[in-house]
């Protein structure tokens, strides 16, 4: 009787998402789908890091063989501080959502949130070139998408916020990028002073989660205006409901941004960017089913 040859299964590269809370995260499902689509040998898990123990959790994960990680609230700024090197997007965002452990043992940080937003906008609207864009909010979500929007060659980017000084601070920061290359495209404006129709209005605030609306004038919405809320849900967000009432040409929620930023992270780690359409449909169907 001869021995059967042993078959060894190649070890899966380990990835994870860190957050607190983390149980709601759709990242393990999304990256599991991406791995299947691209036939990449990897595992992806959600890790609940203690509020005061993110760094220890992350370093333990890497020491145990982890290759890369996503980071969600409330750890994006802590992740930024831990990185040995950073992308331009992460540097300007002041926050990191994607970490890679490099061959020399150092940690590289990137921020793919804005790249995911722009990819989803282009999927819906086509080119963003020359468009007049209003960005509502001046927090971390807004800051992470300004450089990708500018790189997409928008014609004008107006930032508005309840606390106007925060919007102006972002304008001053990003006006200095690449020797002032984008300074003539950037402007801040108080909400009551907004005038004229915009081609695109992006809500980066979390107001929709509480069913609230930023105090925006109706006049900014025309019959060719597209409105985008970074929040999402089974039903239209409060912001997108308002946009429909103003007869906006198109309303879009942030589910595509979620899938898009994940695809950019996956591509950074694996060198292949997965198609997002099938995963997006699965998530949309799951949202609807869970709401019933």
From Swiss-Prot:
Pathway: Metabolic intermediate biosynthesis; chorismate biosynthesis; chorismate from D-erythrose 4-phosphate and phosphoenolpyruvate: step 4/7. CDD domains: NAD_bind_Shikimate_DH. It is an enzyme of class 1 (oxidoreductase). One of its GO terms (biological process) is aromatic amino acid family biosynthetic process. NADP(+) binds at residues 137-141, 161-166, 230, 254. Its EC number is 1.1.1.25. Pfam families: SDH_C (PF18317), Shikimate_DH (PF01488), Shikimate_dh_N (PF08501). The active site is at residue 76. Keywords: Amino-acid biosynthesis, Aromatic amino acid biosynthesis, NADP, Oxidoreductase. The keyword Protein biosynthesis does not apply. It catalyses: shikimate + NADP(+) = 3-dehydroshikimate + NADPH + H(+). The keyword Amino-acid biosynthesis applies. Shikimate binds at residues 25-27, 72, 97, 113, 232. One of its GO terms (cellular component) is cytosol. InterPro entries: Aminoacid_DH-like_N_sf (IPR046346), NAD(P)-bd_dom_sf (IPR036291), SDH_C (IPR041121), Shikimate_DH (IPR011342), Shikimate_DH-bd_N (IPR013708), Shikimate_DH_fam (IPR022893), Shikm_DH/Glu-tRNA_Rdtase (IPR006151). Homodimer. Involved in the biosynthesis of the chorismate, which leads to the biosynthesis of aromatic amino acids. Catalyzes the reversible NADPH linked reduction of 3-dehydroshikimate (DHSA) to yield shikimate (SA). This is Shikimate dehydrogenase (NADP(+)). It comes from Shewanella sp. (strain MR-7). The lineage of its organism: Bacteria, Pseudomonadati, Pseudomonadota, Gammaproteobacteria, Alteromonadales.
